[in-house]
Regions:
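Intrinsically disordered, low-complexity regulatory regions
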Residues: 1-112
Length: 112
């Protein structure tokens, strides 16, 4: 049984849109990585010590919390935002990217 092929056969439009969103997400991640580098997540450490990993993941959690609070405010205002490029969709993509970044940190892959 191939769940991916089965899913794509049953839900072709949904599968295609999901892949488009993943591409948008990756493009945003890549452009932000070129701006920020890895240091903003590793906080100056090599992330080889479990305590450094825990500290980094806690920082990611705090960033996600900020995005969730931003989403809450945006949704209360029916999506009206005051910062260009920081709307509801952008916030959801940021949260999703932070989730992947946390996994990369925890899997010891957050490096060049």
């Amino acid at each position: 049984m191939n769940s991916i092929k089965d899913f794509e056969n049953v839900y072709p439009s949904l599968a295609e849109e999901f892949k488009k969103i993943q591409q948008e997400q990756y493009e945003l991640f890549a452009s932000k990585m070129l701006d920020y580098g890895t240091g903003n997540i590793s906080l100056g450490s090599t992330l080889e010590d479990p305590e450094d990993v825990k500290f980094s993941v806690t920082g990611i959690w705090l960033r996600c919390n900020d995005k969730i609070n931003r989403l809450k405010n945006l949704l209360k205002r029916d999506g009206k935002n005051y910062v260009k490029g920081e709307g509801v969709e952008d916030s959801f993509i940021d949260i999703s990217n932070y989730g992947i970044i946390a996994l990369l940190v925890m899997r010891n892959k957050w490096k060049k």
